């Protein structure tokens, strides 16, 4: 049977999805299933690994059935996943010893403080590109080994395996034959040396983690094993893996130095490809691993805006200024500007490049003439200003000028926001036809690995741009607007 399709498994924080793409990178079928979020204690977040697997395997079957596609027509399956989330299971039985500890979980903060007290903070920054923070996998592994009965003894006997979600899915799909991850996921564990591209023995020793638990690291674009869907049909190659943000970067074909993408979700995730050079940030950005045009390791700078779409949710749910997020474009366009109003949405502090956890949200510039439309417009503009803050930091750190910004995520449907993003950053903003860029990245990696597509050059004809947003304001006005934002941020922090 002719191989006509590639399937991307997109395992996210709240749901598991399977998306079927054809040879022209069109979406043929989508299936999605949410799963349970567990909050056993304040600040703790867990998932049931078996529920992750059940939801992911069921949507894989469902996505093909929904489109009437036989599994024999599938050329390959790619995986993209929520990063950092930590699973440990028994090698012999495949049974998890504890729930998955999710990236958002803060329970291992004390372990991070212990590592800082040991003077490891700079070593971690230099060799992993990360900050010593509970966000990453390493301290979560140590917590499980320290707190689950017999876990440490079993680990030392070589009876336990660790994996991020990609590794867990690969293990289950191959019925325990393959224990592998890729560099983009390994780079989020706090245990991976991004320069030598190997597990770091000093950090394993500091966290008392046996190396035998860790998966083998293989390229993001390669064949890891095979699977049969629901035990039927021929063996399908499992052939591409990348963490969600790096998958989106590849899906946008940001495969060369200076290419960047911004994913507009609840927050915003910005990544800039820095090529073969790992750039250490002086602005609090993370240095991480990305995927190059040939599937090779590239490096990237990564930063996140805490309040992106969440700011619009606040307008809707707490202030009642809008009924639906899409209303913001209409109301923002009803006024020529914000009438001097700035919203700094520091509801949970400010992230990079400010790193001020004590900053709090504020509205500035309110006069008697300020109305609802001005506040709504200021909220949208705040997303673009925060993204500019990060992009400027990336440009300063890397010394690379940014020519264009690729965008994806739910908020890119907002033409006003996209145009203002182009105006305030003075770069062209490109919105793709297929906004499912995370899944598309996994599909591209899988398809390239098995020869379904031949090269990134071929993919450039598949990943079509829907809209080009070009800067439309002059430099003086741009500087005036941004100076107002910087002043508002400074006041928020004082």
Swiss-Prot record:
Protein name according to UniProt: Glycerol kinase
PANTHER family attached to this UniProt entry: GLYCEROL KINASE, SUGAR KINASE
UniProt record, GO biological process: glycerol catabolic process; glycerol metabolic process; glycerol-3-phosphate metabolic process
Top EC class of this enzyme: transferase
Residue positions binding ADP: 13, 17, 266, 309, 410, 414
InterPro entries given in the database record: ATPase_NBD (IPR043129), Carb_kinase_FGGY (IPR000577), Carb_kinase_FGGY_CS (IPR018483), FGGY_C (IPR018485), FGGY_N (IPR018484), Glycerol_kin (IPR005999)
Regulation of its function: Inhibited by fructose 1,6-bisphosphate (FBP).
NCBIfam families the UniProt entry points to: glycerol_kin, PRK00047.1
Residues that bind sn-glycerol 3-phosphate: 13, 83-84, 135, 244
SUPFAM superfamilies tied to this protein: Actin-like ATPase domain
């Amino acid at each position: 049977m002719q191989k006509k399709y590639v399937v991307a498994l997109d395992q996210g924080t709240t749901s598991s999805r399977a998306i079927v793409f054809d040879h022209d990178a069109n979406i043929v079928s989508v299936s999605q299933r949410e799963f349970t979020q567990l909050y056993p204690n304040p600040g703790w977040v867990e998932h049931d690994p078996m529920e992750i697997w059940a939801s992911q395997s069921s949507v894989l079957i469902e996505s093909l059935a929904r489109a009437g596609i036989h599994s024999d027509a599938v050329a390959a399956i790619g995986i993209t996943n929520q990063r950092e989330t930590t699973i440990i299971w028994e090698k012999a039985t495949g049974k998890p010893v504890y729930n998955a500890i999710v990236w958002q979980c803060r329970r291992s903060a004390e372990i991070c403080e212990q590592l800082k007290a040991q003077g490891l903070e700079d070593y971690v920054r230099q060799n992993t590109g990360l900050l010593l923070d509970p966000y990453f996998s390493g301290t979560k592994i140590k917590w499980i080994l320290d707190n689950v009965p017999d876990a440490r003894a079993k680990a030392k006997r070589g009876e336990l395996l660790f994996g991020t979600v990609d590794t867990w899915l690969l293990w289950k799909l191959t019925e325990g034959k393959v224990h592998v991850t890729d560099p983009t996921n390994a780079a989020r564990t706090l245990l991976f040396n991004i320069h030598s591209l190997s597990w770091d023995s000093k950090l394993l020793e500091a966290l008392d983690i046996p190396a035998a638990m860790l998966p083998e690291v293989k390229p993001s674009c390669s064949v890891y094993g095979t699977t049969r869907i629901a035990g039927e049909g021929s063996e399908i190659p499992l052939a591409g893996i990348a963490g969600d943000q790096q998958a989106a970067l590849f899906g946008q074909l940001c495969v060369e130095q200076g290419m960047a993408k911004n994913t507009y979700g609840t927050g915003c995730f910005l990544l800039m490809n820095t090529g073969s050079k790992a750039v250490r940030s002086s602005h609090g950005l993370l240095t991480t691993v990305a995927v190059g045009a040939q599937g090779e390791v590239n490096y990237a700078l990564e930063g996140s805006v805490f309040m992106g779409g969440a700011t619009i949710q606040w307008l809707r749910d707490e202030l009642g200024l809008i009924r639906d997020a899409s209303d913001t474009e209409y109301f923002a366009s009803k006024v020529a500007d914000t009438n001097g109003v700035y919203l700094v949405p520091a509801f949970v502090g400010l992230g990079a490049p400010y790193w001020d956890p004590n900053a709090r949200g504020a509205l500035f510039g309110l006069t008697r003439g300020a109305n609802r439309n001005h506040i709504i417009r200021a909220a949208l503009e705040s997303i673009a200003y925060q993204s500019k803050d990060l992009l400027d930091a990336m440009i300063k750190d890397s010394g690379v000028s940014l020519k264009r910004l690729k965008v994806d995520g739910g908020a890119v449907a907002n033409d006003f926001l996209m145009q203002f993003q182009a105006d305030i950053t003075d770069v062209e903003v490109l919105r793709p036809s297929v906004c499912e860029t995370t899944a598309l990245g996994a599909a591209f990696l899988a398809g390239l690995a098995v020869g379904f597509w031949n090269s990134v050059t071929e993919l450039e004809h598949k990943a079509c741009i829907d809209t080009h947003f070009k800067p439309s304001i002059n430099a003086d006005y741009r500087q005036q607007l941004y100076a107002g934002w910087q002043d508002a941020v400074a006041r928020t922090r004082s």
